[in-house]
Amino acid sequence: MRIWWLLLASGVCTGMVSSQDTCKQGHPGIPGNPGHNGLPGRDGRDGAKGDKGDAGEPGHPGGPGKDGMTGKKGEPGADGHVEAKGIKGDQGSRGPPGKHGPKGLVGPPGEKGLTGETGPQGQKGEKGDVGPVGPEGPEGSTGPSGPTGLLGPTGPIGKPGPKGDAGPLGPQGEPGVRGPRGWKGERGEKGKIGEMPALPKSAFTVGLTVLSKFPPSDTPIKFDRILYNEFGHYDVATGKFICHVAGVYYFTYHITVFSRNIQVSLVKNGAKVLHTKDGYTGSEDQASGGIVLPLKLGDEVWLQVTGGERFNGLFADKDDDTTFTGFLLFSSS
């Protein structure tokens, strides 16, 4: 590329000389930019054959080659010389069975074999002939008693037997005649103080509270304030007294009447036996009742409102009480 720039500069200078007859050398120009790479040239021709190179190092041994084809059978070799006995070879495979040899001599008798299993029972044989009479056997045991013979004549009277055992006690005889009065005996020693017999007991007193006042009608009143129930004969859950000691009892009730009328009944085993009725007149009032009842074991006694909710004015608070009491007067046992 630089050659082209030089030729161009020379041409310009020559033209200027011809026109002006004189030419002065100018300052060198600024170097141009490098040109682009030209196209690659064609491959050169093959050079002449070079000299033979030095021998290379031996290569690594090659792998085993494939088996060649089986060659033709060779001619028999000459007889070899007998050498020393070789090593015993491995045992060959078993050959085919040989032909049967001649029958051998009879061997000695073998030992007695084990007893064989019992064979099945054979068929019943025919009856044999009667054998000769055997010798007389020993005397047999006594046979059973024969039937009773005829009654013989009465024998002579025997000797008296031994005395028999005493017979059972006879019946009691009639009372004898009363004997004369005996003499007065001496005064005995003072006895010890005896223990008092344990008397059966049963008693309770229960009352209403602010929560249980104005009880529902036609059902046992459940008194939930326990004043006395040591023996547990009053059942708080059911409102009933249950008899655990048969006898005669006294039951009583005291009622504070307020806000409504009252009508109550004392009930024994479902039957009403005592009734009390009181009307409310605008101020507190008191009503009561009491009765003596004979009871058997398991009998039930309770108090209930009758006549509906208009007659359940049984009242209780911290200053007023409604109570139900019962206790045993005496047992019947």
Curated annotation (Swiss-Prot):
Keyword annotations from UniProtKB, A to Z: Collagen, Repeat, Secreted, Signal
Domain Collagen-like: 24-82, 84-132, 134-193
Compositional bias segments (type: Low complexity): 26-40, 130-157
Region named Disordered: 19-196
UniProt superkingdom: Eukaryota
Composition-biased stretches (Gly residues): 59-68
Record-linked Pfam families: C1q (PF00386), Collagen (PF01391)
Signal peptide feature range: 1-19
Localization annotation: Secreted
Compositional bias of kind Basic and acidic residues: 42-57, 69-88, 183-193
Protein name in the entry: Complement C1q and tumor necrosis factor-related protein 9
Native species: Bos taurus (Bovine)
Gene assigned in the entry: C1QTNF9
